[in-house]
Amino acid sequence: MIKGVGLDLCEISRMEGKLTDERFLNRFFTSDEVSYIHSKGKCAAQTLAGLFAAKEALAKALGTGIAFDLKDVSVRHDEAGRPGYTLSGRAEQLAGGDRFHLSVSHDGGMAAAVCIREGEE
């Protein structure tokens, strides 16, 4: 059963200046995510915007707002490049064992993320 849907948009140009802001990066992203962002070269700002939007979309799908440390939500990619979440801490508690599906896209200077929360009633 679908229990929640979250959608977030993030302006890519807003994130360009954040690529070298270690305080920002370390506050909101895991070390693996920061490494992933920096590995994207010319696409680093769009990757950063997509990851940030993905975290915000999860908060909306949970229906709690940001009631957890954003580093408790790690966006990862499988072997085929599909994005997904690894939750820990308060985010994992709020999820209550539910599953989350994530889609991220970039176009027209924007990054968009959709998160669908699936679980039992």
Predicted feature locations:
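Core catalytic alpha/beta fold that binds nucleotide/phospho-ligands
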Residues: 1-121
